[in-house]
């Protein structure tokens, strides 16, 4: 066992001590440009696979540092967004900052940040031009109407009370928090590799998604720093996993 694995196990022990381990931000979604490219990459892949409309209702698992990826969905025309997380990383100031920058990116039909800016981000696309074909039958300008933007911004300020277009639920465990057969697209970005009860999570996603809806998950199978090799964690025993995780909500 190398030094990195030993440090992770010691971190697992510390997690049982109150205040021993702090839950750090997840990274990524604190950047509006990251959220913009992630949402439009998922939407582009969905479009190429037959989902050619703007989804009315979307749900994201593990939004992380901000709910910006789902906000990008709302700015592209979605009407309702469910954000589900197990640890509350986000805050009002961060969400509003990301939202305001997203408005500008959409208004300018900005190209998607590509592999040069985010070299590790998947899925990759053949073109990073703004996907105008997706919005050909939809008036993007209407989605960016000043009154709609202000309404969404007001909801972000009071996100835990309003819950009209945006529902942030943290922590979540019961699939019944979202009505069955009510979501057009369920998506996640580098999240499901952290989930322990994966069967429960997939059952929930299939419960929520409408007939004809889609589930879009980008899963990062790398070690996330648990080992020196990208796939070194594959060799860990169940005991090692348990020791590393400790009392943390996820690893």
Where are these regions (language model features)?
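Membrane-proximal basic amphipathic "stem/tether" segments
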Residues: 1-27
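Conserved class I S-adenosyl-L-methionine
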Residues: 53-65, 95-98, 214-240
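Class I S-adenosyl-L-methionine-dependent methyltransferase module
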Residues: 75, 79-166
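A short acidic, Gly/Pro-enriched loop at the edge of an enzyme's catalytic core
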Residues: 173-186
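Hydrophobic beta-strand segment of the Class I
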Residues: 186-187, 216
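A short glycine-rich, Lys/Arg-flanked "PGG" loop and its adjoining helix->strand segment in the class I
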Residues: 199-214, 220
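Acceptor-substrate binding/catalytic loop of class I
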Residues: 239-251
